[in-house]
Amino acid sequence: MINFGIVDNENAQQVYYLLKSIKKNCKFDYTITLMECSKNNPIKNVIDGVKKYTCKYEDANKILREKITENLCILNPNILIKKDFRIEDVSEPFIFGENCYFLPRTDEFKEYKKTLDLPVEIWDGESNYIDWLYKHEHDWKFYYEDFIVSMTTWHKRIHDNATYEALESFVNQKCDYNYKVMIVLAEEEFGKELPVKMKDFVESHKDKVEILWTYKDTRPLKKLDPTIEKYPECPIVTLDDDDILDENDLQKLYIQHMEDPWSVYGSMIDNCYGIEHFDYVCKWVANCRIWPPHCLYNFPLSDFYEYFGGILDDNFNAVRCLYKMTPVKEIKNIQSHKKNDSEIKLTYEYADTDWPNLYSNFIMQHLEELPPDLLYE
């Protein structure tokens, strides 16, 4: 039996993912002690999904101040447990690396005269098991992305300098969190053949950038949906191929997500048209946006073409949030800059589309699916 200790440092989403990975991949007896550090106890009191895990809850200050009655395998919430991780009960305490260390019982800890500050060196004379764990670290843990940045482009823009200026602003952020940039391209358009310029960019940023191929060209919708399918449990930031970010924008956006991980946030927000006799409003966001996991209602792709002209992805996503009762809010301290005339082009497309009637027709055709207790703040 091993007792995992997880310290919640006000990043509820990371702790949630770590708990899920333990449940999925640890095929041995274990217990979990969750130590709350933050004032509002977000894991215990807010995230319902964690309640299905059997955890003991402790105040972090209390457990470190008072006597520790059992060994704890403290895990860094920035990692996940992978594979069928096998572990044996360990009698002697140890500390190693910055991702996993043992917090020993108080009586044992006095013998070692070690601090709990990280990082620390491996203790001399560790057991064979500890040696194995250290050498095979890659077999049982891996880092995960805190969020994914997803964008798409098309054949008339993939060669533009503006596209690569935007991409450089995505990868060169000052951000304390792990993220990856996903460039979604359609096989229908490119046939899995990357232009030389894009191939060179991906190669020069291969630790940060990945190409995601999807067969069908769903135009602007493919900046989000294929990435959601590949990373269903990860928050996703969507950007356009001409968005130029300030160096701290992604950090600001993700911090806002951590404070309110159940809402969609965007740097521009507006109200869609209301429907007569219905007391609600549908909100849509544009520009720099972050989408939490499971925030969109699953409407068929055909609805995007029939009711939204195959171009109004922001509006389609708005009704998908509406039917999932996902709050949609504005983040005010981010303002991405457009590098070309895409906003003008989209404004004309929007003006030429009979959006009010399309929206009204969509709602009337999906009344049975409309949540009865629909509320927006």
Question: Across the structure, where does each feature detected by a protein language model lie?
Answer:
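Active-site beta-to-alpha loop of glycosyltransferases that engages the nucleotide-sugar donor
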Residues: I6-Y16, S38, M151-E165
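A short, glycine-/small-residue-rich helix N-cap motif at loop->alpha-helix starts
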Residues: Q14, C55-R65, Y215-K222, G310-I311
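Short, acidic, metal-binding catalytic loop of nucleotide-sugar glycosyltransferases
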Residues: K20-D29, A166-Y179
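A conserved acidic beta->alpha catalytic loop
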Residues: E36-I43, L185-M198
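Active-site nucleotide-sugar/metal-binding loop of Leloir-type enzymes
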Residues: N61-N71, L224-P235
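Short beta-strand-to-loop acidic/aromatic patch adjacent to the donor-nucleotide binding site
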Residues: E70-L80, E233-D242
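Conserved catalytic core of nucleotide-sugar-dependent glycosyltransferases
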Residues: I81-E126, T227, I244-E306
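C-terminal catalytic/acceptor-binding lobe
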Residues: K113-I148, T152-T153, R157-A166, F304-E377
